Amino acid sequence: MVATPSTSAPTKGVVRQVIGPVLDVEFPAGKLPKILNALRIESKNPAGQDIALTAEVQQLLGDHRVRAVAMSGTDGLVRGMEATDTGAPISVPVGEATLGRIFNVLGEPVDEQGPVKTSDTAPIHRSAPKLTDLETKPKVFETGIKVIDLLAPYRQGGKVGLFGGAGVGKTVLIQELINNIAKEHGGVSVFGGVGERTREGNDLYEEFKESGVINAEDLSQSKVALCFGQMNEPPGARMRVGLSALTMAEHFRDVNKQDVLLFVDNIFRFVQAGSEVSALLGRMPSAVGYQPTLGTDVGALQERITSTLEGSITSIQAVYVPADDLTDPAPATTFAHLDATTVLARGLAAKGIYPAVDPLDSTSTMLQPSVVGDDHYKTARAVQSTLQRYKELQDIIAILGLDELSEEDRLTVSRARKIEKFLSQPFFVAEIFTGMSGKYVKLEDTIAGFNMILAGELDDLPEQAFYLVGNIEEVKAKADKINSEK
């Protein structure tokens, strides 16, 4: 396990000031809690209702006072209430018992399924793994999804940015990745819902149950743990829930020695919450009103997401770009940490091409001959140049029609349309909607299939045979079926 912050003996303090989610607490001389320690306040408000609140120490003010940020609403809190220093940072449950459950930032279950059956906990603030413990050789993480594995491969222990508007298939893609890592890699997933809508979190949970990612009958057979800090919660909770999810993922990597997928939706909300907390603590804002510690905050989270010699955490982070401005400090700082980007295009979704991953806009630092090999690299670049040429010809086709193109361009268009259709595939988690069995396509089969299309070996097969299939053998079988029905 990575080194954890030292703990100190619990002491009692008194709340002296409450301003929104920020509270000042006075402690006896020489008994001040350490920075990042959790304070616990358990009392009754004037109406006699119970108050149970956790806050995290952010500043030592002098005069035996500390300033802390609350992890839940401060309604009913009054001066004079007793606050206990827990002597350690916020800790969350870890291990197999977390699978199939939903937690808040404090690691408390919020799914009404009873207490978590584990005594194992870990603090959310920890050091990143030492350089000597890191796996430095880049290794491709096979997802079984053709378009990703061929054109924008993920790095094992890397970070991927997931870009896309509403309704283009982000959730289904996330579910499929969770399903595939469990079945093919024996890994598990952790989902961190950071500052998004409660409705979306509920929908995701229900869809996970529907698709079998969460097994409601036997939670131990589930493939994912969920950790939510929704947009109605105080900024402290939204700022820390990403670390709570990451801590659960680190346990699977470091103790169980598994490959883990960590989903963060949305990484921008993590930065936004940090900005709110920074302003509440009275720090001078930096560019565009963001916190002056923006780079450090993002780095502290991202540096813990990595491959070690024991296992890996591969992170897929949904990135909201405010006002579509890629130069905004929040997305710009995030981009510096990403190894790959998966861009979902509405135009492809409208054509019925699922997954709607844009083959020209999606990128990966792994797509280089020294990492993926010459064959993979050349195939990927040939596929992209064919699709790029097709894109350039679309205006001419729209105005003059296909017949006005040269023989060579007509052939390019024909192959590009087959490539576009072959980049689609049926998903396991979508079986209940499509009625088609899902397909996991091995990387070598993907490369071989696209090479055959590019070489013209499949020019005589009908276009629709390439739509929503797995490997090239299925294309041929589908083509035979189409021809026999004519």
Curated annotation (Swiss-Prot):
The keyword Membrane is annotated on this UniProt entry: yes
Catalysed conversion reaction: ATP + H2O + 4 H(+)(in) = ADP + phosphate + 5 H(+)(out)
Keyword field contains Ligase: no
Mode of membrane association: Peripheral membrane protein
Annotated residues for binding of ATP: G164, G165, A166, G167, V168, G169, K170, T171
EC annotation from Swiss-Prot or TrEMBL: 7.1.2.2
Keywords (A to Z) from UniProt: ATP synthesis, ATP-binding, CF(1), Hydrogen ion transport, Ion transport, Membrane, Nucleotide-binding, Thylakoid, Translocase, Transport
InterPro entries tied to this protein: AAA+_ATPase, ATP-synt_VA_C, ATP_synth_F1_bsu, ATPase_a/bsu_AS, ATPase_alpha/beta_chains, ATPase_F1/V1/A1_a/bsu_N, ATPase_F1/V1/A1_a/bsu_N_sf, ATPase_F1/V1/A1_a/bsu_nucl-bd
GO cellular component: plasma membrane-derived thylakoid membrane; proton-transporting ATP synthase complex
HAMAP family cross-referenced by the UniProt entry: ATP_synth_beta_bact (MF_01347)
Disulfide bond annotation, renumbered to this chain: none
Location in the cell: Cellular thylakoid membrane
Organism whose genome encodes this protein: Prochlorococcus marinus (strain MIT 9515)
Protein name: ATP synthase subunit beta
Domain of life of the organism encoding this protein: Bacteria
NCBIfam families (alphabetical): atpD (TIGR01039)
Similarity comment: Belongs to the ATPase alpha/beta chains family.
Oligomeric form and interacting partners: F-type ATPases have 2 components, CF(1) - the catalytic core - and CF(0) - the membrane proton channel. CF(1) has five subunits: alpha(3), beta(3), gamma(1), delta(1), epsilon(1). CF(0) has four main subunits: a(1), b(1), b'(1) and c(9-12).
GO MF annotations, alphabetized: ATP binding; ATP hydrolysis activity; proton-transporting ATP synthase activity, rotational mechanism
Role description: Produces ATP from ADP in the presence of a proton gradient across the membrane. The catalytic sites are hosted primarily by the beta subunits.
